[in-house]
Structures are given as structure tokens and as C-alpha cells.
Amino acid sequence: MDTELLKTFLEVSRTRHFGRAAESLYLTQSAVSFRIRQLENQLGVNLFTRHRNNIRLTAAGEKLLPYAETLMSTWQAARKEVAHTSRHNEFSIGASASLWECMLNQWLGRLYKNQDAHTGLQFEARIAQRQSLVKQLHERQLDLLITTEAPKMDEFSSQLLGYFTLALYTSAPSKLKGDLNYLRLEWGPDFQQHEAGLIGADEVPILTTSSAELAQQQIAMLNGCTWLPVSWARKKGGLHTVVDSTTLSRPLYAIWLQNSDKNALIRDLLKINVLDEVY
């Protein structure tokens, strides 16, 4: 039996009006009437008596009512349980493109190597801007956010994972800032507050991107420089620090909902080092 037919039957019995039932179910009145006829044909009985606007349950309808309520309640419970089981095996992690490319990609590999403790766990690596990911976290569409900024909402829990160092890199040795075009790699709003002092107040980026891979590939072609994590740049090779530049230490945080049903799992996963070099 189609559960939608029972749902329609229950709504008509509640409102005693085909028009109001149609509005509640976001259907046309003719669609509601058609569903009731289908159910009556399947059961071989009339479920309602219709006298103008006076709609009443027949004796057969009265007998069906408690069974329909039980069936719909059981169906809803089954759907919820199945959905919870499916969702329970999924774990979504969100971060910016640059964080995934420079450090989280390696961490994800370590999570899979340690899957014995979490057999069957399905990871989703989600890439987006921080503002979008915070919204997803708040709406329970994301389990864990990795970011360079501490949370600003009371309903979030957080853990400082460590620090990493950014340095200004270019593709050739012995270069000065004044000789190079600036490529802005987005490391968060709080980094941008210091950016002008680190680069030069009048320096206009020739390119802005959230991808470290893209920025690294473009600096040679654009005679440019960009801020990259030191450990990642060393592994890449072929990169040189700009002579008259400094380094900058950045924090890395894990953020999740305080009342998340995956609190224990999150803390367990965070025991596996996110950063290759933690200090």
C-alpha cells in the first residue's frame, strides 16, 4: 500500500475538508479526491460520507483510522532510523582549498590508515570558504571544520591543533618584494588584517585565489610571490623565500558543535596529528 494514500486519508479525517487537506499536503483538491478513491478501491469500501461540506468517516473509515495512524507512525520511525544509520557512517570535514592542499590531504590519508578503530566510516572532504562552512556546521550539514580562526559562537567547541609557519615564496633566489608581483592566497580575514604591513600598503594583488597549488604554479609565470606554508613549500621544491620578507605563525583549529552526536568520534579522530610538524 502507498503510504501517501494513508497520509492523505489521515489528513482528510483530521480536517474533515478536502480543500483544507489539499492545502496542508500541498496538493490540488482533485489530487486529494483521487488518492481517497484509490484507497477506497484498494480496500473495497467507502471511507467517507460526503453531504455538501459535511464530510464524515464511515464505519469502515473509523476502523481504518487507528491502523493508519500506527502504520504511518511505524513508517516514520523506520525512515528516521534508517536515515540515522546511514548518516552515522558518514563524516564530513570542511576546510579551505589551501588547507586541504597543504596539510589536510595528508591527514585524511592518516585517517584512512587508522580505519581499524572506525571500520565503515565514510569521509567527505568538503572545500568551501570559511563563512559557508561555519553556516553548514551551524545547520548540522557539516561535522567538523578545520580553520585558522577561533570560533566566535558559544555553541561551538574547538581544539587548537597547533601552529604552522607561512613565508613569502617566489620561484627564483635572491628576489626582493619590490621586484615581484603579489599573488594573494586567502588565509582568512585575520591574516588579511596584517597583510598590508607584511607586503606593502600600496601593493595590489595581481591574482587572488584560495588554492595554494594554483598560486604556486602561477608565481613563475607572473614573476610573483605568495604566502605558503614552509613545510609544504620545502616538499614542493623549486621555491625560494623573498629576501626582505619575514615569516608568520598561524594557528590551526578544529571546530564542531558542542551538542554534536559525534563528539566522541571527533575527539578520537583529532588524536591523529593534523599537522606534520606540531609546535
Swiss-Prot record:
Segments of the chain annotated as binding DNA: 18-37
GO molecular function annotations of the record: DNA binding; DNA-binding transcription factor activity
Domain HTH lysR-type residue range list: 1-58
A Pfam family: HTH_1
Cystine residue pairs: none
Top-level taxonomic group: Bacteria
InterPro entries named among the record's database cross-references: LTTR, LysR_subst-bd, Tscrpt_reg_HTH_HdfR, Tscrpt_reg_HTH_LysR, WH-like_DNA-bd_sf, WH_DNA-bd_sf
GO BP of this protein: negative regulation of DNA-templated transcription
Record's keyword terms, sorted: DNA-binding, Repressor, Transcription, Transcription regulation
Cross-referenced SUPFAM superfamilies: Periplasmic binding protein-like II (SSF53850), Winged helix' DNA-binding domain (SSF46785)
Job description of the protein: Negatively regulates the transcription of the flagellar master operon flhDC by binding to the upstream region of the operon.
HAMAP family cross-referenced by the UniProt entry: HTH_type_HdfR
Family according to the record: Belongs to the LysR transcriptional regulatory family.
Protein name listed in UniProt: HTH-type transcriptional regulator HdfR
Species of provenance: Escherichia coli O7:K1 (strain IAI39 / ExPEC)
